[in-house]
């Protein structure tokens, strides 16, 4: 019986994870569930899964959770705050951790799971984007197992030589596919008029609002490129992005002999989640088998960097190295939140990120303190740019 902590249980990845867990009560038991502010939903999940621990973002949220559960709180250790998150991730009674907290907030608890030698199902790409070599060094030092849950990285992992899930061994290049989001064919001159609801209406995937906006700008793919660089030790010049509107091929690995291996499937996060939970076995995930005859045509095109400047910025940050990816991620988080609050236009997201990258000093990412200092500096710089932009508009 595998005991699982779900970091970010109330998000879309949390939903999909718990759906797979529910299908296999003989294999999996929930040890801990965490959420930030969605206390109502967390209370409902606690009633169903009866975790040993539940963690929320604040003392107030913890009191609300206790009140909502009432007598049903018996046997559930309700805690709050960042330290409690790390304890849930590293607890000796937990075997595997689904790392699904969105953004920089997920780095410390994910690292705590790594340092405790857990099986880490990595859905929080920002952890690797920010800390890179520090993260992978911790994986090796503490003997953790990291299984990528992003559909692209999960596909790459499946297509690489087994027992050697890293670059080399005859691999020529790695191709990450991207749907192109909801604005792939929209006139570029109209993108400034895009609303948050339009940006969050992804054509293929059901996701949270932040990652949906990242998909619309293709920053999500840029972050995934950086993640792939660290996960698989791939030089930036061997990483390629290809737009594939149907989201059926989730990524590809090209080999020196001319072979190209691809992983296909319906666009449903339960597939990579089930793979990560059961690896190296396979289990039923509730996802229909792919019907290629019904799918028909599979199309591909190169990304237009004029339409998607955030993708180019991500490649620039990866090439710059050091703290540049952490700066990129922080500026993007601030910009996306400002867009969702209607403080800036959709097209200004890239402007905020580009200005922040250009104006923030980049140094070696040689410690977590350095990474978080760069993150904080970038957030201040991005907020300053947004405030100045709002005054001018």
UniProtKB/Swiss-Prot annotation:
Residues reported in the UniProt entry to bind Mn(2+): 150, 152, 224
Family annotation (InterPro entries): DXP_reductoisomerase, DXP_reductoisomerase_C, DXP_reductoisomerase_N, DXPR_C, DXPR_C_sf, NAD(P)-bd_dom_sf
GO molecular function annotation: 1-deoxy-D-xylulose-5-phosphate reductoisomerase activity; manganese ion binding; NADPH binding
UniProt: NADPH binding residues: 10-13, 38, 124, 126, 208
Reaction(s) catalysed by this chain's protein: 2-C-methyl-D-erythritol 4-phosphate + NADP(+) = 1-deoxy-D-xylulose 5-phosphate + NADPH + H(+)
GO biological process: isopentenyl diphosphate biosynthetic process, methylerythritol 4-phosphate pathway involved in terpenoid biosynthetic process
PANTHER family with a match to the protein in the record: 1-DEOXY-D-XYLULOSE 5-PHOSPHATE REDUCTOISOMERASE (PTHR30525), 1-DEOXY-D-XYLULOSE 5-PHOSPHATE REDUCTOISOMERASE, CHLOROPLASTIC (PTHR30525:SF0)
Known role: Catalyzes the NADPH-dependent rearrangement and reduction of 1-deoxy-D-xylulose-5-phosphate (DXP) to 2-C-methyl-D-erythritol 4-phosphate (MEP).
Full protein name: 1-deoxy-D-xylulose 5-phosphate reductoisomerase
The organism of origin for this protein: Ralstonia nicotianae (strain ATCC BAA-1114 / GMI1000) (Ralstonia solanacearum)
